[in-house]
From Swiss-Prot:
CDD domains: F-box_AtTLP-like. Belongs to the TUB family. It comes from the Eukaryota. Pfam families: F-box-like (PF12937), Tub (PF01167). Ubiquitous. PANTHER family: TUBBY-LIKE F-BOX PROTEIN 14 (PTHR16517:SF95), TUBBY-RELATED (PTHR16517). This is Tubby-like F-box protein 14. InterPro entries: F-box-like_dom_sf (IPR036047), F-box_dom (IPR001810), Tubby-like_C (IPR025659), Tubby_C (IPR000007), Tubby_C_CS (IPR018066). PROSITE patterns: TUB_1, TUB_2. Residues 56-114 form the F-box domain.
Amino acid sequence: MSFRSIVRDVRDGFGSLSRRGFEVRLVGHRRGRSHSAVHELRDGHAAAAAADVVQSSCWANLPPELLRDVIERLEASEAAWPSRKNVVACAAVCRTWRDMCREIVKNPEFCGKITFPVSLKQPGPRNGAIQCFIKRDKSTQTYNLYLCLSSAVLVESGKFLLSAKRYSRATCTEYTIFMSADNTSRSSNMYIGKLRSNLLGTKFVIYDTQPPCNTANVSQSGKTSRRFYSRKVSPKNPSSTYSIAQVSYELNVLGTRGPRRMNCVMHSIPASSLEAGGTVPCQPDSVLARSLDESFGSISFSKSSIMDRSIRFSSSRYSDISVGGPMVGGQALGDSDESKERPLILRNKAPRWHEQLQCWCLNFKGRVTVASVKNFQLVAATQPAAGAPTPSQPAPPPPPDHDKVILQFGKVAKDMFTMDYRYPLSAFQAFAICLSSFDTKLACE
């Protein structure tokens, strides 16, 4: 039997284990919140019973050598979406299969692939960039992020990743970010963060629903963090209270037209992450350490639920690195001497003036085709470290990663924009930064 046949049999058998329990769950969802709460306990028992059946089935007792061979072959052959959903299906079979996937399936930093939704909050690849595109809908004020599956930037050729919705307030603008294009409620477990601007649209703060690593105990006092996989979380829990980054646009006091100038302070990423041997803290070195196991905390045991978005995943936590610290309820966290480390600061790459075209130009390597004030490229800003050389002393050359474009964003058609990101940014962070470029800036242009 080929490994493709094994995977097909697993999906079919897995879907028939608890079809009755899945139907009960669907009925509960149709009846609304109050009725679904009544049936929640019954659904939980059905899911638990199905989990016990799967755990004791023949698939859970496959010889480790055979199981490893199946997963390794599948990981190598199903490298791109939509066929990569088979890897997700294997990780959803049982704990034994999930543990094997934990050993074999690596995060985007090392494999350059987005497999599980938790990958959206993990750093991008070190070698190369993950190519995405954003589709804007002005009528509904929504922005959808897709993974490019081909050279053509079309929704039909993209894998949906994230969605954002714009809300105008009296003194600010908010962009709420979700893992679903349909469920855009703040009380939903699809809600993962937001972007908030000031009145002028010159300063933005990126918020995440998950706290930095060293703030788990602080978040329980007054502000409670939510876990996406838990079905017992009240929808009235407070959301996104952790500031992880700040984006600022320089004011244009002279009123002359020109490119925007922006800076990003990534409180959750240390500047040392770009140095030789540097890493983003609280990220797994080679496997989906803890988040993958939490990703399947409330799986619906059916074939359709495995292949669709009813699989719920946890979010990876951010680092405890901060200068000024991430903010929780207006108070800085992690300000001890041990935790103080310079955050990564990104700045936009200065464009050059093209005399023949009479416009400012950047080399996007064919990924951007329409001139727009929204287009930008971000590189690491050079920061003087402690004990930096004096002006009379020659400064050492910056690390090679400081010259690389970490994030680029630009227009390709009406309401279509490309977004390419790499290490140390995650897809969530890159998407939030790009959303800031859409907002109206009264004093920057």
